[in-house]
Amino acid sequence: MLNFFAAAPRGYEYALSLELAELGASEIKESVAGVYFSAPLELGYRITLWSRLASRIIFVIYKGPCESPEQLYNAAYGIDWQMQFSNRSTFSIDFHGLGGFIKNTQFGALKIKDAIVDRFRDDDFSRPNVERVDADFRIDAHFRRGEITIGFNFSGPALHKRGYRSTTGEAPLKENLAANMLVRSGWQAAQVDLLDPFCGSGTILIEAAMMACDIAPGIHRERFGFDHWLPHNKKVWEELLNEARARASIGKTRCEIKFYGSDIDSRLVALAKRNAENAGVLELIDFNVCNALDVKAPAGSGYLISNPPYGERLGNVTSLLQLYYQLGDKFKADFGGWSIAILNSDVELLSALKLKADKQMKMNNGALECAFNLYTVHALNTRRVDPANIKIEGDVSDIAVPFANRIKKNFKQLEKWAKKEGIDSYRLYDADIPEYNVAIDKYLDYVVIQEYSAPSEIPEAVTKRRLTDVLISLPSAIGIDPNHIILKTRERKKGTNQYEKLAASKLELITTEYGAKFKLNLKEYLDTGLFLDHRLTRKLVGEKSKGRSVCNLFSYTGSASVHAALGGATSVTTVDMSNTYIDWAKENFALNGLNSDKYQFVQANCLQWMKRTHDRFDLIFIDPPTFSNSKRMEDSFDVQRDHLAMLTDVFKLLNPGGEIIFSNNKRKFKMEIAELEALGMSVKNIDNQTLPLDYKRNPHIHNTWLITHAG
């Protein structure tokens, strides 16, 4: 008996051990990412030819303790290598495992290489050459917990490479993963009709057809690791190949199972047909170009097994949630009596199906950990009602009905109001229903969802499910393209700057506000370039600016400065510490045709600039951050702690008869009115003038003050 190790992805071990037992192996022992077994040479060949789950078969030559570099060298040197491969063959070493004296795998590989070369020389043979990329003979070594296993790659190139695939789609599924899905779903045992509505390059269906027709998975392969192994018995191997060809011929004539595959991409369907033809099963599979939501269930019952698109693969998350929600409808309405198995790396997408899983398994797709869920559709169901059209007093569906109804109500009211107001961007929803803790802003025909951090006592699974329901409900509630929904996470942080960059991608739009135009960037930063809650404050700045010199401190993208300039200001000075936002402010001025020397842009620390400037102004707008500890600031800034000192400096810049509009977003802000009045200021809260209709549900979003000279 010979010893072997069948390597496979983690999670395959149990199914692989059953397959090996069925093929006739003995002394089967599961390990991490594989299974040890014993078999005579003929059976070792047979397993290599017929295993659908293994990644590779390793012929084990030596296994024993290894506690030092010397022990590793001696273990490799003790093998009679000239009986394994010719010195005219090239070789390579794949070393796996770390720990103890093995600090990196290259060290282990070099030790074994030295031992092999020395053994050949000591036995009076010239040394074989190392070929790292495409060696004739690949030695495989595993080091784990003080034990070394040395063997050679009996099967050669990875066994999932069956030999029938011409090229792959954008997100190919490995053949042994497809086989594992067929085994673990129960289809291999059931042997019934099979449908894959996201067939891609056809892997699941081709693997299934090969199973049903008794076609060996290795029958189309041209290379094996034992080709350059000196004890290789070509006669036995050829007999096994002939037997496999005969079984395939008989199996194809007896197969009565029907296979159905479809994909929306005609290029992929053509590729699937070529792959199926190469595998010899094209005549068994009915391939069609079709949207998965339009697929008709074949008569009777069967299995639907698929790997639909998910987050890492081909799609925007919001549109994918919509797809999965509609798939759930499709399955319930049209696939009564069917068994369904779905592979996905995103459990939130699976939850959007709104189906209860009979079984949930983990299954890796390459390095990506996935869920493999099995469902049974027990009876035909009518299609669910669109959540946006459900009345709260009616039947409550499994989707967020109150949220959908609130969104629809808000949209109807605010869309009409926005058109009258002369704006095209507004806040649609702001945690109106506490369970759905998001803010939703509409920018033209795009929507930005900001997810607030949930309280720690709420389970993460609950918050994820609620967010999923929000993303599913929103497109139909307001008639927006799911691809136009952008999701961000906003935490109420302390000790960090609010202007952190989020992503490299940009999505720029031009929005209009009371005749002013502003550039938006919906993706790159947490904020978009325009604080919608300050809309009326900016309008007020514009109304007060005619014939006056204006200064905008902590200007962000200069939107208040634009309103001041359009309002007739004699000069506008825009100050911000960020070069990015100063440049953005200049773009906003250019958008509005405002090009003049009377518009000044200053990149500076506002707190320091106020102390050193000699300029004086008639109107100053100051909207500092709640907190900042930017690298460009020597000290941190806290608006509650520092507003008195800051406003004292601002007041010194004010001309007689001038006004300061001071605003901030600290929810529990307390103005030091008495102290300011003692310094000769008149202070008036003007929140009621600056809170727009779309923020009436959140009256503490900001607080605004008008400051003038007393008397």
Swiss-Prot record:
Pfam families in UniProt: Methyltrans_SAM, RlmL_1st, THUMP, UPF0020
Keywords associated with the record: Cytoplasm, Methyltransferase, RNA-binding, rRNA processing, S-adenosyl-L-methionine, Transferase
GO molecular function: 23S rRNA (guanine(2445)-N(2))-methyltransferase activity; RNA binding; rRNA (guanine-N7-)-methyltransferase activity
Record carries keyword DNA repair: no
S-adenosyl-L-methionine as UniProt keyword: yes
Protein origin, superkingdom: Bacteria
Compartmental location: Cytoplasm
GO CC list: cytoplasm
Domain THUMP: 43-154
Recorded catalytic activity of this chain's protein: guanosine(2445) in 23S rRNA + S-adenosyl-L-methionine = N(2)-methylguanosine(2445) in 23S rRNA + S-adenosyl-L-homocysteine + H(+); guanosine(2069) in 23S rRNA + S-adenosyl-L-methionine = N(2)-methylguanosine(2069) in 23S rRNA + S-adenosyl-L-homocysteine + H(+)
E.C. numbers: 2.1.1.173, 2.1.1.264
Record InterPro entries: 23SrRNA_methyltr_KL (IPR017244), RlmKL-like_Mtase (IPR000241), RlmKL-like_Mtase_CS (IPR053943), RlmL_1st (IPR054170), SAM-dep_methyl-trfase (IPR019614), SAM-dependent_MTases_sf (IPR029063), THUMP_dom (IPR004114)
Primary role: Specifically methylates the guanine in position 2445 (m2G2445) and the guanine in position 2069 (m7G2069) of 23S rRNA.
Family: Belongs to the methyltransferase superfamily. RlmKL family.
Protein name as annotated: Ribosomal RNA large subunit methyltransferase K/L
Protein species of origin: Shewanella halifaxensis (strain HAW-EB4)
